[in-house]
């Protein structure tokens, strides 16, 4: 009776496993097409995980059934016709699952043989394991920007057995990240704002002639010294770091209460610190309209005397800074 019932489950088991493997491969291909959508990629990952878990559960059920009256059926399915005795029947099943995983990975990746591993991308190694019937281990890499830019690109590297100087590299997915070194430099620019009374943004009644300086991303423009009027307030900020472009000069002429504000971020300059050699131009004006040349030097001793402003917005009023010495 056992021999008459044993052939029945074998085709059903093989058909179920074949369909699930096919569905898993299709889900892996779909994952490669949805790399640009992190949310869709997470759903595909869950689908692949569900397929793998169902296949493992089906294998366990088949192994449990093999311990009873269907032992010869499990031997036929896992060994492919080569019957084995005792607990050795589980080893071919494990090999078959490993082969399924390898086929899935190869179907969604592109393999190349190279001499140099430097491909111009930023990779981080997260694992390595020994490969059966291979002399060299396989290393697993992910994109460095997996978490900050949600880039899911991966690569696998293994030294070739027949040519140790060459590497077989398998790329899975495509890079969707951007190198931070190519990002636009954040520069400061001057926003011209003249307001009377209270404002909706909570600045609280700027007087005419006030200047609101906001440090946000904007293209810098060269300063035309000849076009600047005689009455001006020049602010020079000296700080360590790369050279930034001069800030844009904005302001109107024709009104006595609208002086020009010129800000520039440059490395340390002896002329700016000394206040001579063209640092300030004396004008034929009274004490209430004189030129103010200020130089801010960045140091740890000077930090204690500095006032920090909320939201990186600083309001300079000419009536408040007249006569101050920096």
From Swiss-Prot:
Record's InterPro entries?
WRKY_dom, WRKY_dom_sf, WRKY_plant
Cite a single GO MF annotation: sequence-specific DNA binding
The entry's note on the tissues where this protein occurs is:
Expressed in aleurone cells.
Q: Any signal peptide, and if so, which residues?
A: none
Q: Does the keyword Protein biosynthesis apply?
A: no
Instruction: Answer whether the UniProt record assigns the keyword Signal to this protein.
Output: no
Which compartments does it reside in? Nucleus
Quote any Pfam family the record assigns. WRKY
Give the transmembrane ranges: none
* Keywords for the protein's UniProt record, in alphabetical order: Activator, DNA-binding, Nucleus, Plant defense, Stress response, Transcription, Transcription regulation
In the induction comment, the record states: Induced by abscisic acid (ABA) in aleurone cells. Induced by salicylic acid (SA) and infection with the rice blast fungus Magnaporthe oryzae. Induced by benzothiadiazole (BTH) and salicylic acid (SA). Induced by cold stress. Down-regulated by drought stress.
**GO CC terms in record:** nucleus
User: Additional comments on file?
Assistant: Plants overexpressing WRKY45 exhibit enhanced resistance to the rice blast fungus Magnaporthe oryzae. Plants overexpressing WRKY45 exhibit increased susceptibility to the bacterial blight Xanthomonas oryzae pv oryzae (Xoo) and the bacterial streak Xanthomonas oryzae pv oryzicola (Xoc).
Q: What is this protein called?
A: Transcription factor WRKY45-1
Query: Which source organism?
Result: Oryza sativa subsp. japonica (Rice)
Q: What is the lineage of its organism?
A: Eukaryota, Viridiplantae, Streptophyta, Embryophyta, Tracheophyta
